[in-house]
Amino acid sequence: MTQLEMQGLAAKNASRVLSIAGTAKKNAALEAIASALEARREEILAANQEDMTAAKAAGMRPSLQDRLALDGSRIAGIVDGVRQVAALPDPIGEITKMSTRPNGLVIGKRRVPLGVIGIIYEARPNVTVDA
């Protein structure tokens, strides 16, 4: 099993836990992500510097290098994005578009967790939070 497959399986297993978690628990997880990004800021910047060095050595276009680059401001933006998601109303469990069929059957749509989404990108570390 490849590393990507193992990460996908771990994400799928985690999604089962999150799918039944309440809003407070999900928001606590998002806050933990934001706090970890802040706490590990210097480590993230050091790793990004390694990525930038490799990108330059590989001849990556300057426009892609700019998208790859992180600084304190960009990390703060990512952290802010995570906290904005936590501040949104939780739509899970919401029932919409209720209707009654001629035979009396009541039908509605219930919002449920989407599941796991994989995102592959070459040069935008913030895209995961933006998505």
Region locations from a protein language model:
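N-terminal Rossmann-like NAD(P)+-binding subdomain of aldehyde/semialdehyde dehydrogenases
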Residues: 1-107
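Conserved small-residue-rich beta-alpha loop and adjacent elements
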Residues: 91-131
